[in-house]
Amino acid sequence: MMSDIQIRGSLPLTVLASALAVMGGVGQAQAANLKSGGDWDVNLDTTVQYTAGWRTQERDDAIGNHPFFAEGDYKFDKGDMVTNRVQGMVELQGVYQKNTGFRLSGSYWKDFAYDDKVRTNPNPAFSTFLSYPSGVYSPETKKWHLQGGEILDAFVFHNTKVGETPLYLKAGRFTQHWGNAFFFGFSNIAYSQHPVDYVKAFTQPGSEVKELFLPRAQVMASADLTPELSVSAQYFLEFRANRFPQGGTYLGPFDILYSGPTSGGAVAGLFGGPVSAGKSYKPKGINNNFGVKAAWSPAWAGGDIGFYYRQFDDVQPWAAADIYAGGGGEVHQTFARKSKLFGVSYERTFGTLSTGWEVSYRTDTALNSAFSNGLVGVPYREGATGDIVNVIANGLYTLPQTPLWDTGLLIAEMSYTHLNRVSRNANLYNGVGYASCRDSVNAALPGAKADGCASKNALAVAFLFEPQWLQVGPGIDLSAPMSLTYGVHGNPAYAAGSFYAQGTKIFSVGVKATIRQKTTVALQYNGYKWNTSPKANVPGLGTSYAGFGGNGPVALNDKGWVQLTVKTSF
């Protein structure tokens, strides 16, 4: 209940005052036109966002007592401010003679709620296996969660004709989203086309995948062969991995994971010596990653048909651990190479209902795999790979005016995954009926879906419902966005399938005001729920969820929080 939450932490008053001042005059705000007329048209756009958030749930002791979840769970208490973040993005675009140009954008952020101190369970035993032995975050973790910046888009383009055929060329760092999927980033045609920012996804449930894409260096060409047929091709010059909240932060799903932590923490006790963490064994930047697409819209189809072929290195890592011969080891990330995808999409509109379908077949893609190969002195560089079929269907419906709302939208999407075969390293596949699927309480027994083991078939759904009320005040539109992602049946076989495991609930509910179509103010609640394993008492540590905690990132189960966001552009 909100009424019993003691709110700690305050808004930076200068930032809030500035945001309110901008809101007051935002009706006249325009992008800065640096040069227009003649051959060049150059524009500078700036977006500023302020986000505040507070933890609303009490700590679940079975999470706080878990050696792999304690640091993230003890970073903030109920009522604490978990984010107090100012972020800005600047975009510079220039167009020469309306057919040639460039785009450059960058982002900078600072979160005043975070310091660099690592916190954990006050039980003295937990201080012996910190994922940051120095007691402070690594530079990598501080960059993404305290203060940092990055270049986003950086590309040039040229539009021309070859004979009578329009040709569009682009080179540099940018994003391109193929297919029709809205929400499911691990099972869509665009999987691994670009890395996905799951830091943003966890803090903004209901975001569309294309909004979460991170740019990647590439060259791309598209041509309109006929009014009904176009073709595109892209070749990548850079590899980038999916971005997740780092271990030991509020929404970090596992204390020792990803590129931030420097120690394997409690794994040291299992491996008989110190365990390092944070290293990534990435594919080469230029590794023959490419894609081709044909878009066809014949009159008889009543819509658009897409055909796709892609070869890529998976951007979703395996979390893996090496056991050294002399004791100790290493926790790291490694990636599947040269996966292939064949896909077909179709989209069609029926009045106010827009529908989309995707069917894709992925070969030698990364599957849910064991954390360790169990072999002393043998490096673990590749988990299980296999062939999977993914089907996505969705619809976007524009709400008609009713006594309850003026307009709005409803988006619904279904994702189905079928494992066709395990192609390599079947002994490492963490799937029901395979050797690496073990019971959470007794590792001598075979495991099940409840233990996080993948199943042959899996189904998940996602919804976004946002009714709108127009002109509730001068220049103000109001909406109430609500989202839900739910794991209906089974655990997907692909790596990170646990995010959509059976029983998963990722949800948000809120209210948003749009002021003169330039500024938004949103207040929402975000929650997460995965099925947990049985509780077990660990001597010296207390009672916690057994094994890895359940069938997904259960460390987030007690991380429900209220979020206030103010965003404007000029």
Language model features: what each stretch is:
Residues 46, 88-94, 104, 153-158, ...:
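Residues on the lipid-exposed face of transmembrane beta-strands in outer-membrane beta-barrel proteins
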Residues 40, 70-72, 80-88, 147-152, ...:
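Residues that define the transmembrane beta-barrel architecture of outer-membrane proteins
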Residues 81-83, 87, 309-317, 356, ...:
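Detector for outer-membrane/organellar transmembrane beta-barrel domains
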Residues 72-78, 138-143, 203-207, 249, ...:
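Extracellular loop and loop/strand-boundary signature of outer-membrane beta-barrel proteins
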Residues 98-255, 460, 489-491, 504-505, ...:
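Outer membrane beta-barrel
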Residues 30-44, 57-59, 92-102, 115, ...:
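Short loop/turn motifs that connect adjacent beta-strands in outer-membrane beta-barrel proteins
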Residues 50-56, 108-112, 173-177, 235-241, ...:
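Transmembrane beta-strands of outer-membrane beta-barrel pores
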Residues 518, 554-570:
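Outer-membrane beta-barrel "beta-signal"
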